[in-house]
């Protein structure tokens, strides 16, 4: 009994109803079309029909249990009524909203069609138009076709007119348009179905939440209610307690034959004890199975935690067994080999670098010597330039002194020229005086010629005296003329000499001025060249320092470039060799990859097959394990029933030895079907729990009188099961 009461907690509502209906006895249950129990209890003549279980010891418990079951069923009906009322309110609200929505859409659609008709103008009936085939009508979908059938004519007419106004398109475009419209229509239908499914899912989720809440409340109430009646019933079934006076009644009932195929109280107690033992054995087995499953679950949880720990923090062994670790290990070995090779090459390169450093130092020393030689040469050139500069300065000083001397001589010559000029002026004055004297003498001579005309009148002695005077004057004049001639010659010579000297001096002055200008030009040119040489010397010194730095840098860069060139050549040769080896490895790897791809494809197919096989095996294993558990529980129950049947067999053997024919007939009548009275009971109806033979149940199923012969409760094709008494 505890198991039978606890089972509705985890079952559905229909299962609860079935279990509650099973608890009602066959004689007390009534048909759905029959009147209520109170009216059924009264007869026509006012007498009362005795209850078939009136003399049973569990009458009061049965009545209380029936009332409790009826009350629970009424509460269940009440809860269903409340849930259905809430659903009805929600559906009515949604229906009103959707009706308003559809009316608005219908009005909008009519307005749209009317506006399109007014825009398109009057309907031209005579004009032939191509038939319009669109996916907007949703002809292949029942819901859209059902809702849009009333609008299909308007839709077809208006869209046909729109199509007639459109530009003629090629058939490929029309086909693509029709396919696109069809796909869009399918998409809209799928979206509508999806929205409908989502709405249904939301409603079902809400109902599931409400049902789960009701289930939790009912479970609490059931746990609260189990503590009274169930404990009492368990106590009664375990202890076999009976009401006072029950022994005599039971003795009388044992002598009587069972009414309507119902067993006696002792047999019912034994059956209940057997059922209790079966349930206890089943519960024991289920406990063992649960303990086993819990242990397996604990092992699996521990394995899962271990695997999670290993997954979060794998050990070195786990890393060592992975393919990635093996691949990395092989790569690491290759890298170690390469590192060793590179270390050897590094040692060799270090030796070469030391050698190159020594060569570089030697070359640097050589370059330093060369630069020192060049610097010495440049310094010698600089000294020569300085000596030339000193010599030029000395020449300049000499030229300046000569210039000063020439200036002094020129001044002296200027004084001589002034004196010569004065002499020339004096000579000119003398010449002027002599000219005036000559003029005077000429006048005297003219006078004398005039006197010669009167010479005849002059005496001879006067003439002789005059002649003598004249001869003396003439001689004096001759002497004076000769002296004057000599003086004039001297004057002319001196004058010509002075003129020549002056002309020579002038030429010399002109030449000296030219030489002075040349000397000045040379001096300024020498000064300019000196400054230029000084600048050149400075620039040469700066360039020399820079060139020495540049030369050292160039030598260093040349050494580095040579070393880099050697290294690059070595690296190029190494890379060529490595490239060749890598190319060969690449070809081998490509071939191996191709082979591995083939193997991987095969392995993937095998893995997929094994996955499918593992899934099927898992499902079959789960079903087999569940079937095994069910079989184990059935085996335990069958073992208990076997033990009870063995005990009853021993009892019956003992009774058969005592020739107790009345008990045998009673048990035979209990085992026989209450309908045909010829076959044993082997089929139970699930809806009410009454037991009949298989032939009677199948006969009622084939004749469509699918109601229990005892309680008239209806049952279906799958509402019966085979039992073993």
Curated annotation (Swiss-Prot):
Pathway: Protein modification; protein ubiquitination. It comes from the Eukaryota. The keyword Transferase applies. It is an enzyme of class 2 (transferase). Pfam families: BRE1, zf-C3HC4_2. Residues 18-32 have a biased composition (Basic and acidic residues). Residues 257-267 have a biased composition (Polar residues). Belongs to the BRE1 family. This is E3 ubiquitin-protein ligase bre1. The gene is bre1.
